[in-house]
């Protein structure tokens, strides 16, 4: 007909509540790149996040329910990197790696740890997680045993009103400095994400952010 190409398809796709089955995603074609030109390799275990931070597009793109790959998929991707000769950092690009804690603790992390032990720890892992990681000593211990040494955490702001404003409820009412130090105490370096410019921010927000970073020892 005379309608622009893709109009009908676009309407259908934009209204769907279906998500891709990531258990069917192929192993990345690492042979298409020169890995020697990269500081780190990326793999993905899950998509989606149970939280609803107002500024974040991830839940719109991937949904609130974390969808996860099978453990053997993750190991196969690690195998493929290892076979390509990669030795070094591997970043799990999940926006919240710990969205499904039970599966991680019971299956995925123990399997990765065993895989690493069998190959004399060829990789170091980093990822992103919500601050409630600090509430789960077993999870932090298993992450370190599996080879994780760095985690990025969205701190955003030490100002409670600003956390309320952006619906970052998982950070509200917490001693965020203590949470960071707890994560660090298990051997994980904490990198932090921060935001300034909320309507609720006081004039002192820059000084408060600097003070928080210095107190927490965050990277």
Residue map of PLM features:
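Radical SAM [4Fe-4S] cluster-binding motif and immediate context
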Residues: 23-191, 198, 204-207, 211
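Glycine-rich beta-alpha loop elements in corrinoid/cobalamin-binding modules
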Residues: 1-21
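Conserved beta-strand->loop/alpha-helix structural units within folded catalytic cores of enzymes
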Residues: 188-193, 216-218
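C-terminal accessory regions of radical SAM enzymes
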Residues: 5-10, 204-219
């Amino acid at each position: 007909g005379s309608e622009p190409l893709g109009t009908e398809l676009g309407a259908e796709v934009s209204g769907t509540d279906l998500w891709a089955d990531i258990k069917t995603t192929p192993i990345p074609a690492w042979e298409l790149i020169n890995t020697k030109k990269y500081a780190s390799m990326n793999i993905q275990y899950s998509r989606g996040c149970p939280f609803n931070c107002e500024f974040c597009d991830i839940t719109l793109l991937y949904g609130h329910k974390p969808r996860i790959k099978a453990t053997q998929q993750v190991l196969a991707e690690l195998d493929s990197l290892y076979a390509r000769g990669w030795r070094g950092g591997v970043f799990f690009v999940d926006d919240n790696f710990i969205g499904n804690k039970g599966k991680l603790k019971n299956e995925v992390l123990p399997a990765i740890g065993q895989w690493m032990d069998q190959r004399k720890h060829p990789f170091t892992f980093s990822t992103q997680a919500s601050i409630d990681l600090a509430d789960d000593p077993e999870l932090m211990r298993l992450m370190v045993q599996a080879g994780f040494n760095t985690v990025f955490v969205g701190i955003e702001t030490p100002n409670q009103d600003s956390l309320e404003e952006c619906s970052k409820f998982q950070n509200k009412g917490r001693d965020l400095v203590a949470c960071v130090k707890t994560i660090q105490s298990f051997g994980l370096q904490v990198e932090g994400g921060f935001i300034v410019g909320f309507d609720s921010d006081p004039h002192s927000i820059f000084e408060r952010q600097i003070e928080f970073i210095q107190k927490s020892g965050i990277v």
